[in-house]
Amino acid sequence: MAGNLYLVSTPIGNLEDITFRAVRTLQECDLIAAEDTRHTALLLQRYDIRKPLESFHAFNEHSKVEKLISRIKEGLNVALVSDAGTPAVADPGFLPLRAALEAGLEPVVIPGVSAVTV
């Protein structure tokens, strides 16, 4: 049974501006693919989330997207996060989103705080 790709929105500035659903998703996933692992590590540390963390950014996404999709097809639940905001909007993430859709997967978007309200 295939896992899921979760596009998890992260805080824009204040680490406390994250939704309960986003924290739960990060806690329950098998792997977190992050635009900047150092930046994301601070968020994970703040919420005591201990999951494998891999870099997935504009400079390596072309070489990593197939493996990421294969892992999801094998049953892993993968959370994709950017440094701030929603992946695939103005950040890396479009490529894995498109690849997931082409593979017949149904990515799940975990919305967050809007820049308009921050």
Region roles according to the model:
Residues 1-59:
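Glycine-rich, flexible N-terminal cofactor/catalytic loop recognition
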Residues 17, 63, 91:
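Residues that form or flank phosphate/diphosphate-binding pockets in enzymes
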Residues 21-23, 46-49, 68-70, 92-97:
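Short, glycine/charged-enriched secondary-structure capping and boundary segments
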Residues 37, 62, 113-116:
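Amphipathic alpha-helical transducer elements in NTP-driven molecular machines
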Residues 49, 61, 73-77:
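Generic short alpha-helical segment signal, independent of protein family or function
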Residues 60-69:
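Glycine-rich, highly charged phosphate/nucleotide-binding loops
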Residues 73-118:
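Short glycine-cluster motifs
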